[in-house]
């Protein structure tokens, strides 16, 4: 059974001082507002309302921690790209997200949610470039794949895979749909492996998704990546 089936809400964080102790394993979920991040979390956990789903962008306001048992945590980050945010709020989130994502010792990887109909937006690319210096794994979920034909889905997958292989070899990618459940089993198996649950993902899926072979996961640092700010609300 996937570790996601044990997910329960743990805590919400709006200040660095409120972060739980950095023990165990954390995987962060990030993505543009309304890309389907909350739906993906709920689908993986087989819950209807573990993460709040809204048609209104920007509803996730804090770092929401969900405990999966045995010091394993899923961390739901605020969606980026939502314009209706005051400057002071945006600056606060730049500090909070920047410090968390780049210095958190217990953070083992990030799941980056992209709408399969609109992948690799400028903010998505910014997030990839900004996170790359950590040398930590990134798995891209191309959500809402049910909105595409099979041919369209494969074309999008090929395009994103080509981009990642060239620039971010520590990344893997797959199609995903909370509606049709395409890719749910594969995503759960990969993330179970990240959590060290002993459940191994299908190796064929991982190679096709563009994950690096063992020992080849360190991406070159993009130019000026350390000087970039994380994409947050209002950008």
From Swiss-Prot:
Binding sites annotated in the UniProt record for GTP: 31-38, 58-62, 76-79, 143-146, 176-178
Any one biological process term the GO annotation gives: division septum assembly
Residue ranges annotated for the EngB-type G domain, each copy included: 23-197
CDD domains documented for this protein: YihA_EngB
Entries under InterPro entries matching the protein: G_ENGB_dom, GTP-bd, GTP-bd_ribosome_bio_YsxC, P-loop_NTPase
Location of region: Disordered: 202-235
Keyword S-adenosyl-L-methionine: no
Sequence positions that bind Mg(2+): 38, 60
Biased composition, class Basic residues, residue ranges: 226-235
Cofactor(s) required, per the database record: Mg(2+)
Superkingdom per UniProt: Bacteria
GO function terms (MF aspect): GTP binding; metal ion binding
Record GO cellular component, one term: cytosol
Keyword terms, alphabetized: Cell cycle, Cell division, GTP-binding, Magnesium, Metal-binding, Nucleotide-binding, Septation
Gene3D superfamilies found in the cross-reference section: P-loop containing nucleotide triphosphate hydrolases
Family: Belongs to the TRAFAC class TrmE-Era-EngA-EngB-Septin-like GTPase superfamily. EngB GTPase family.
Function: Necessary for normal cell division and for the maintenance of normal septation.
Protein name, as recorded: Probable GTP-binding protein EngB
Taxonomic classification: Bacteria, Pseudomonadati, Pseudomonadota, Betaproteobacteria, Nitrosomonadales
């Amino acid at each position: 059974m996937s570790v996601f089936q044990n997910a329960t809400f743990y805590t919400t964080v709006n200040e660095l001082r409120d972060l739980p102790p950095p023990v165990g394993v954390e995987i962060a979920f990030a993505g543009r507002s309304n890309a389907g991040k909350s739906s993906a979390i709920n689908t993986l956990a087989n819950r209807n309302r573990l993460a709040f789903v809204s048609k209104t962008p920007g509803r996730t306001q804090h770092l929401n921690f969900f405990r999966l048992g045995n010091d394993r945590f899923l961390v739901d980050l605020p969606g980026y790209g939502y314009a209706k945010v005051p400057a002071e709020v945006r600056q606060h989130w730049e500090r909070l997200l920047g410090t968390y994502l780049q210095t958190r010792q217990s953070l083992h990887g990030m799941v980056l949610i992209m709408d399969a109909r609109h992948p690799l937006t400028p903010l998505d690319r910014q997030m990839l470039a900004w996170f790359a210096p950590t040398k930590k794994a990134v798995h891209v979920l191309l959500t809402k794949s049910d909105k595409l034909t099979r041919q369209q889905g494969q074309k999008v997958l090929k395009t994103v895979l080509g981009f990642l292989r060239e620039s971010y070899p520590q990344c893997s990618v797959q199609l995903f749909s909370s509606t049709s459940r395409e890719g749910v089993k594969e995503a759960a198996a990969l993330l179970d492996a990240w959590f060290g649950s002993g459940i191994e993902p299908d190796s064929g899926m991982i190679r096709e998704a563009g994950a690096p072979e063992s020992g080849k996961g360190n991406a070159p640092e993009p130019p000026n990546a350390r000087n970039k700010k994380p994409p947050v609300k209002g950008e």
